[in-house]
Amino acid sequence: MEEIQRYLQPDRSQQHNFLYPLIFQEYIYALAHDHGLNRNRSILLENPGYNNKLSFLIVKRLITRMYQQNHFLISTNDSNKNSFLGCNKSLYSQMISEGFAFIVEIPFSLRLISSLSSFEGKKIFKSYNLRSIHSTFPFLEDNFSHLNYVLDILIPYPVHLEILVQTLRYWVKDASSLHLLRFFLHEFWNLNSLITSKKPGYSFSKKNQRFFFFLYNSYVYECESTFVFLRNQSSHLRSTSFGALLERIYFYGKIERLVEVFAKDFQVTLWLFKDPFMHYVRYQGKSILASKGTFLLMNKWKFYLVNFWQCHCSLCFHTGRIHINQLSNHSRDFMGYLSSVRLNPSMVRSQMLENSFLINNAIKKFDTLVPIIPLIGSLAKANFCTVLGHPISKPVWSDLSDSDIIDRFGRICRNLFHYYSGSSKKKTLYRIKYILRLSCARTLARKHKSTVRTFLKRSGSELLEEFLTSEEQVLSLTFPRASSSLWGVYRSRIWYLDIFCINDLANYQ
């Protein structure tokens, strides 16, 4: 019991004091503003997430007014005209919340750096690579092939915002910072939108999105503390996919690893080729828990998690938010992809003395596909095509120059190819490329008041060559030696570590 309690309690040694004085420093707001650039970058606009209202003059004025304590008094008589920070309440509150979010992230950033430096002989990894959305998919490729059932969990929101404040008390002992946090939650937040919203991923305020996402993630982090203990108890060594045993290139590496483990401890070898007990991933207000075993075991997991979250995390949780699905017969919308696990047949020839025989093996493979129907629906919603996928012109962009129109369409096409580079089948991407290319041609023809054929004859087909060379340029830079066999590269899945948000057209949910 003591060991379980130790895992459930956060690391108290990582608590940090005196965070509140940082809110009066000018560089905090500059760092917070720069850190938030392009966090909501769209493929349709240049810099929609850029807030051009920030200036050092406003920051100085804000800090000066914060030193005057009477500006923190809340007027209960008039809720529309609050005395907080004068007339620019919305702008100042947004700036303070962004700065405060940057400040409270400092203890977590220090803890992340210290944990990453403990691996590979105190070598610090590039932590920003871990933020990439694509970094999750290779992790799933190596693990999901072992598992049978999956729990689809819709993560609930806390029943009261005071619970969010209580989760941070383990990390921040500065009472002033916690009081300021309560002030923001009760003064600038609609409680009903947080608790009763039907779309948990979009229930946050757009202006203070980073601030409230941080609070929510820290809260879910405490709810997930039990998985650390269960994972450590389920396996002692990092498992390797059994599909690699069929490849001769990995055989000698397995032998060397076996000898290494035999020399240390014989009992540990029992865990070497043992499949993982469970696998947990959280994304977009949802989470999936995959595990070995039968349907009965997953049903026990379901009721265990519900009871644990209700008692330990004060969650209003019910079993209807968890669904059990068989992994091989179920596909899900996973971060813009249509993900599933399919059986990949493999035949191995084995020879024993003078006799040889063939062995058929069906290996589970994590498959990622482009959801063509929802993606065409997103293109139709953005007025690039009809609901049936027929390209149409974009009248809103017809007032722009030809180069700007081509650049916008080309940027959308490049971003979609970049995001869906990990797709198992890329043929659907070329259909999207055809829609965007013809929509661009129709938009240019509409601007010049002519037909598409007449415009292309007059301007030349090289005007749209950007659509032809976009993915070739990316692949030639990524794989300089694969230019002769570029078709083989197209068929392979490529995961990038520079994708920090889902594009508008990819986020079709």
Curated annotation (Swiss-Prot):
Domain of life: Eukaryota
InterPro entries given in the database record: Domain_X (IPR024937), Maturase_MatK (IPR002866), Maturase_MatK_N (IPR024942)
Primary location class: plastid
Keywords, in A-Z order: Chloroplast, mRNA processing, Plastid, RNA-binding, tRNA processing
Any one GO CC term of the record: chloroplast
GO biological process, one term: mRNA processing
Pfam family for this entry, one: MatK_N
Family affiliation: Belongs to the intron maturase 2 family. MatK subfamily.
Task performed by this protein: Usually encoded in the trnK tRNA gene intron. Probably assists in splicing its own and other chloroplast group II introns.
UniProt protein name: Maturase K
Organism: Nicotiana tabacum (Common tobacco)
Lineage, broadest ranks: Eukaryota, Viridiplantae, Streptophyta, Embryophyta, Tracheophyta
